A protein has these predicted regions:
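Loop/helix-junction capping segments adjacent to catalytic residues or to phosphate/diphosphate-binding pockets
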Residues: 25-26, 78, 128, 205-208
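N-terminal Rossmann-like NAD(P) cofactor-binding subdomain of oxidoreductases
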Residues: 1-65, 69, 101-103, 175, ...
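Composition- and surface-driven signal marking solvent-exposed, interaction-prone regions
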Residues: 134-137, 210, 227
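Conserved residues at beta->alpha junctions
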Residues: 22, 125, 198
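Glycine-rich phosphate/pyrophosphate-binding beta-alpha loops
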Residues: 109-112, 200-205
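C-terminal substrate-binding/catalytic lobe of Rossmann-fold NAD(P)-dependent oxidoreductases
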Residues: 42-48, 52-195
Length: 227
C-alpha cells in the first residue's frame, strides 16, 4: 500500500524507494515482535552497545576506540526510540501511522568491537507472559522472510541461549551467516517484567545483508520484476 501510494505521488510506473530500519534496532525489535499481538508491549528501556563498523570505521582508522567506550552516538538514541514505532505501526491511505505503544527510552554507546551491536533490554507487557512462553515464542517465530524461504533469510530467526554468558559478540555475531538474532540472559526484573540481552551483526543483518534480503522480499512479493 505504501509503495503504490509512493509510485502515484512520484509518477513512476516501476521505480520506487524502499528503505530498511536503522542497525541499532535490528536485535531488540525482532526479539520483541513475537509478543505484541498476544501480550502487548507496555514500556521498554534499551541500552545498545554498538560496534565501530557502525560508524564506518576500523580500529586502524579509529585508534582512539581501542580499549575505549564512548557514551554518545549522534542521533542514534532518537532513532532507537522512534523507528520501532514506525516498524510496529500500520498503513492508512498509503501512509505509515506510528504505533502508540510501547513507550521506549534508549541509551546508545560506542564500544570497542569491530562488528556486532548488542542490546540490554528491559520490558513490561500489558499481559505478562511466563519465561517459558517467551522462549517458546522466540523458538517458533517466523518473519515474512522465513515464511517465503528467502535465500538470505536465516532458517532460525531468533535463537535463545541458555548459557549465562551468551550471546557473545565474537562467538555469535556470525550465526547463520550473520543474519540470525541471538538472545540470552532472560530473567525477571525489579522495575520491569523481564530483562534480556540480544545481539545482531550490524553490517550484515543490520546493513548490507538486510538490504539484500529486502530486495529478495520485494522480488518475491512482485514489486521487482524482470523487464
Amino acid at each position: 500500500a505504501v509503495i503504490a501510494a509512493q509510485k502515484k505521488r512520484l509518477g513512476t510506473k516501476r521505480g520506487f524507494i524502499a528503505v530498511k530500519s536503522n542497525c541499532s534496532i535490528q536485535s531488540y525489535v525482532p526479539a520483541l515482535s513475537p509478543f505484541r499481538a498476544d501480550f502487548g508491549l507496555d514500556k521498554i528501556l534499551v541500552c545498545t552497545y554498538q560496534a565501530i563498523s557502525g560508524a564506518g570505521k576500523t580500529f586502524k582508522t579509529w585508534p582512539e576506540m581501542v580499549d575505549n567506550v564512548i557514551p554518545y552516538i549522534g542521533g542514534e538514541e532518537e532513532k532507537s526510540e522512534q523507528e520501532p514505532m514506525k516498524v510496529w505501526g500500520r498503513v492508512e491511505n498509503g501512509v505509515i501511522v506510528n504505533a502508540e505503544k510501547p513507550l521506549i527510552t534508549a541509551q546508545c554507546l560506542r564500544v570497542a568491537a569491530s562488528n556486532g551491536h548488542m542490546a540490554a533490554v528491559f520490558v513490561s507487557f500489558d499481559k505478562k507472559p511466563s519465561m517459558d512462553e517467551m522462549k517458546a515464542r522466540w523458538a517458533a517465530y517466523k518473519g515474512r522472510a522465513q515464511e517465503l524461504g528467502l535465500p538470505s533469510a536465516p532458517k532460525l530467526f531468533l535463537r535463545y541461549f541458555e548459557e549465562p554468558d551468551r550471546p557473545q559478540t565474537r562467538l555469535d555475531r556470525m550465526n547463520e551467516g550473520g543474519m540470525q538474532i541471538s538472545i540470552g540472559r532472560l530473567r525477571p526484573d525489579t522495575q520491569y517484567d523481564y530483562k534480556f540481552v540480544c545481539l545482531s551483526h550490524n553490517t550484515l543483518r543490520g546493513a548490507a545483508g538486510g538490504a539484500v534480503e529486502l530486495a529478495e522480499l520485494l522480488t518475491a512479493e512482485g514489486y521487482i520484476t524482470a523487464k
